[in-house]
Each structure stands twice: as structure tokens, then as C-alpha cells.
From Swiss-Prot:
Its EC number is 3.1.1.96. One of its GO terms (cellular component) is cytoplasm. The gene is dtd. HAMAP family: Deacylase_Dtd. Homodimer. SUPFAM superfamilies: DTD-like. Gene3D superfamilies: D-tyrosyl-tRNA(Tyr) deacylase. A Gly-cisPro motif from one monomer fits into the active site of the other monomer to allow specific chiral rejection of L-amino acids. This is D-aminoacyl-tRNA deacylase. It holds the Pfam family Tyr_Deacylase. NCBIfam families: D-aminoacyl-tRNA deacylase (TIGR00256). It comes from Cereibacter sphaeroides (strain ATCC 17029 / ATH 2.4.9) (Rhodobacter sphaeroides).
Length: 145
């Protein structure tokens, strides 16, 4: 699985004007299941992200996790993280998991983040979503399982 993690002051996701999820301080996690991924990869990535120390401590150093700060997570599916741009001008997405697997793993990943004690909001798999965020830092991290 691939994830792009952004430390945010706030974030929200809407579909056709309907607010699906919003958070205050925490993490916006854009996630993509790849060919061959399973629940083990989703669980491992969620556990790593839950422990990722990218929030400032009292000394101003990035030494606290989203759990440590009481922050939340907004988890949004984004198959375009599987883009292959090595040839031509049009990205290919064949490395992404098939839609049924992608949706199952996206839901599993979000549930695993929540199981880590992090309040979790989500988007809608496969929908044309509008994501708003106020990046804090900015801090943006790329992770793969």
C-alpha cells in the first residue's frame, strides 16, 4: 500500500456538496492499495502511521505522534498514487489494486487507524471527492508497506 500523509490544522472531504468527513488538527492520509496488497500490508502501514512522530513536542521538535497529540485522521482513497509516469505523457495506473480489492483494503486501513485509538473520518471510495486541507508546516510524508 502507498500513503501520502500530510500534517494538517484541519481537513475535510465532500462529494457533490455533501460533507462526508472533517477533522481538526491531525493527519490527512491519502491511501492507495497496490496489486498484490492484502490486509497484512494495510494493517502494518496503519500501525506505522499511527506511531509516526511528526508533531512538535514542547521543545519544538517533531517527536509526537497523532495519538500523542489527541489528533484525528481523515483517510481518503486515491488510486492515482499508483501512477506510473516513466513513459509518455499519460500516467498508467495498472499497478493499483482492482477496485473491489482496493475498496476492501481502504476500508480495512481506515478501520485499523481507528483501532489505534485515532478518531477517523473517511471519504467515499471511487467518488469524485473535493478535499480541503490546511497543511501544517508543511509536513508531507510518503510511505509504502
Amino acid at each position: 500500500m502507498r500513503a501520502l500523509i500530510q500534517r494538517v490544522s484541519e481537513a475535510s472531504v465532500t462529494v457533490e456538496g455533501e460533507l462526508l468527513g472533517e477533522i481538526g488538527p491531525g493527519l490527512l492520509i491519502l491511501v492507495c492499495a497496490m496489486q498484490g496488497d492484502g490486509e497484512d500490508q494495510a494493517s502494518a502501514l496503519a500501525a506505522r502511521i499511527a506511531k509516526l512522530r511528526i508533531f512538535k513536542d514542547e521543545a519544538g521538535k517533531m517527536n509526537r505522534s497523532v495519538r500523542d497529540t489527541g489528533g484525528a485522521a481523515l483517510v481518503v482513497s486515491q488510486f492515482t498514487l499508483a501512477a506510473d509516469t516513466s513513459r509518455g505523457n499519460r500516467p498508467g495506473f495498472s499497478a493499483a489494486a482492482p477496485p473491489a480489492d482496493g475498496e476492501r483494503l481502504y476500508r480495512h486501513f481506515a478501520a485499523e487507524i481507528a483501532a489505534c485509538g485515532i478518531p477517523t473520518a473517511t471519504g467515499r471510495f471511487g467518488a469524485d471527492m473535493k478535499v480541503r486541507l490546511l497543511n501544517d508546516g508543511p509536513v508531507t510524508i510518503w510511505m509504502e508497506s
